[in-house]
Amino acid sequence: MKNGARANIHLAVDTGMSRIGMTPNEASADEAARISRLPGICIEGMFTHFARADEADKAFYEAQYKKYREFCEMLCSRGVDIPIRHCSNSAGIVEGLDSNGLDMVRAGISIYGLYPSDEVARDRVKLVPAMELKSFITYIKTIGPGTAVSYGGTFVADRPMRVATIPVGYGDGYLRSLSNKGAVLIRGKRAEILGRICMDQFMADVTDIPEAEEGDQGTLIGRDGEECITVEELAALSGGFHYEIICQIGKRVPRVYLRDGKAIGKKDYFNDIYEGFGYM
């Protein structure tokens, strides 16, 4: 206020998430009206968050949306204008739940081209996965029967095997719970993970990919030829949630941004590289 600045704010309304926001009642409406009259404050918008819009049964969503609309009416009756009204998360967007009367949406998991759940109407919106995770083979060695691989010896070879090392681990956000379960795509074929995933590396079986060699690309998430490893597959194998898989990928992993299959930018936090973002 001393600098003559104005804060544009959005009010949060708790309609059923029990996370943040005003309870939608008369007392809260009075409080919002008082806030709207404060100097240096402009109520630019108001939002709520759907807790169960990704479920087939929309009853809870409908109850939340009704509370939100009623609270908007309470504010309007007190002379409070709400220019931007927004509720929908990715599930709401895919389902087209509140396309009438609102001004904005807040996409989350759908930005990555992923559906929020198996219960949303996927035929309404065609999403294409936008993220891949790739690395390469740094080393290949042959081991004999009885040889243990990685910490704890949880995998022991029962035959001669070719073992490839990939420089990605749980320090990069590649879940340790994928140990002895996950796979990496090499030359369009699946190479199963052997033993425990380390902090910075893991090992994979390339015995049946004789053409594999050091320097070959390894796809941890994404497509290689006819094979594909999805985020949902990794979530199922790890006993987790596909949102977690996306969020776990750490800053040590360089980001390369593509448009029409061509690299247009790169972020490499480790080497302090930020290229190609002048257009943003």
Please give the residue ranges for each predicted region:
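Bulky hydrophobic/aromatic packing residues
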Residues: 10-12, 25, 221, 233-234
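C-terminal accessory subdomain/extension
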Residues: 142-280
